[in-house]
């Protein structure tokens, strides 16, 4: 009797572990990076990718007559992107056209699917306040921050001396997710 109970208990534990691993695998296909302290978040957009919230920043540009928002995430497989906009979505364009992204729109939320890395411009009612999305593949060959040939900027805000970064021969500049 004890042997049957032990076997049943082991099977239940194995099934629970498999279920937990499958949940982790599903959630592991999207990586979003926390917003660094001091970055201004956009009040125009909210982005969610497969249920994962993605911070949306206000871009710092020289074009003071326009507002730009940016967001980025890493992913693999096919993901569902939901963008909530305070701007009208009546005349929405997603560029470039080569990706042929045609979202479904329900009031203030646009939903579409991505299955490959891309950089796109989400432009509600023209391009006065676009959201630029950097949709990257999952990283596989992350350089070591201890490598003497790597200039490594980890998550957070960085202000290089004099605003310049000088690379020497055979040096690599690496910006980790969440670095600005």
Where on the chain are the PLM-derived regions?
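N-terminal secretory signal peptides that target proteins for export/translocation
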Residues: 1-10
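Extracellular/periplasmic carbohydrate-active domains that bind, remodel
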Residues: 24-180
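Bacterial N-terminal signal peptides
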Residues: 14-23
């Amino acid at each position: 009797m004890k042997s049957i109970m032990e076997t049943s208990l082991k099977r239940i534990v194995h099934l629970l572990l498999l279920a937990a691993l499958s949940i982790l695998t599903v959630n592991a296909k999207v990586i979003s990076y926390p917003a660094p302290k001091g970055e201004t978040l956009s009040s125009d957009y909210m982005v969610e990718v497969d249920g994962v919230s993605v911070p949306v920043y206000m871009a710092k540009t020289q074009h003071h007559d326009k507002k730009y928002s940016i967001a980025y995430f890493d992913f693999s497989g096919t993901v569902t992107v939901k963008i909530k906009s305070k701007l009208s979505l009546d005349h929405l364009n997603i560029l470039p056209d080569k990706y042929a992204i045609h979202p479904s729109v329900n009031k203030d939320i646009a939903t579409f699917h991505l299955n490959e890395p891309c950089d796109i411009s989400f432009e509600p009612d023209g391009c006065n306040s676009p959201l630029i999305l950097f949709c990257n593949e999952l990283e596989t060959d992350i350089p070591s921050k201890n490598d003497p040939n790597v200039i490594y900027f980890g998550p957070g805000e960085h202000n290089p001396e004099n605003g310049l970064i000088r690379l020497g021969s055979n040096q690599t500049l690496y910006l980790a997710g969440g670095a600005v």
